[in-house]
């Protein structure tokens, strides 16, 4: 069942939102707002969970492979937590930069700790931990 709601937005904010949803290919504002709400709920589930529930997340890392021992540090963290690493993809972006994408699974607090450890490793140019969900609790 769908419920209709109303929201109030400043003109400039609405214009930017409409531009964003057009760029992303949404057919209407409702779909875009539903996705934003789902994303917020997934983020909350990760941060507010007791840490015992099994969670899945994706970690994205970009780094210079020529950086002193960085690749070894990242590999060491992964091997220390090998049971949590479901999959790893390594891409050579250019002659110096690598993209690493990891799928992690385990207790929520362990997944977050490992992901944050990887992202915070000195020399990582870009890193992001993205929680994932099967959507059972999202309606």
From Swiss-Prot:
Keyword Transcription regulation part of the UniProt annotation: yes
Cofactor(s) essential for the protein: Ni(2+)
Top-level taxon of the source organism: Bacteria
GO biological process terms on file: response to nickel cation
Molecular function GO terms recorded: DNA binding; DNA-binding transcription factor activity; nickel cation binding
Pfam families the UniProt entry points to: NikR_C, RHH_1
Cofactor: how bound: Binds 1 nickel ion per subunit.
Keywords: DNA-binding, Metal-binding, Nickel, Transcription, Transcription regulation
InterPro entries the record matches: Acetolactate_synth/TF_NikR_C, ACT-like_dom_sf, Arc_rbn_hlx_hlx, CopG, CopG/NikR_regulator, Ni_resp_reg_NikR, Ribbon_hlx_hlx, TF_NikR_Ni-bd_C
Binding residue positions for Ni(2+): 79, 90, 92, 98
CDD domains per record: RHH_NikR_HicB-like (cd22231)
Function: Transcriptional regulator.
Family: Belongs to the transcriptional regulatory CopG/NikR family.
HAMAP family tied to this protein: NikR
Protein name, entry field: Putative nickel-responsive regulator
Taxonomic source organism: Anaeromyxobacter dehalogenans (strain 2CP-1 / ATCC BAA-258)
């Amino acid at each position: 069942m769908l419920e209709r709601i109303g929201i109030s937005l400043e003109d400039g904010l609405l214009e930017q939102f409409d531009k964003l949803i057009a760029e992303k290919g949404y057919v209407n504002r409702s779909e875009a707002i539903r996705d934003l709400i789902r994303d917020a709920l997934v983020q909350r589930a990760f941060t507010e969970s007791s840490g015992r529930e099994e969670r899945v997340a994706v970690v994205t890392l970009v780094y210079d492979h020529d950086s002193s021992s960085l690749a070894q540090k990242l590999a060491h963290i992964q091997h220390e937590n090998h049971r949590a690493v479901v999959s790893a993809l390594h891409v050579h972006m250019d002659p110096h930069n690598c993209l690493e994408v990891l799928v992690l699974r385990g207790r929520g607090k362990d997944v977050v700790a490992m992901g944050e450890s990887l992202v915070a490793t000195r020399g990582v140019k870009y890193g992001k931990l993205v929680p994932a969900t099967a959507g059972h609790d999202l309606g």
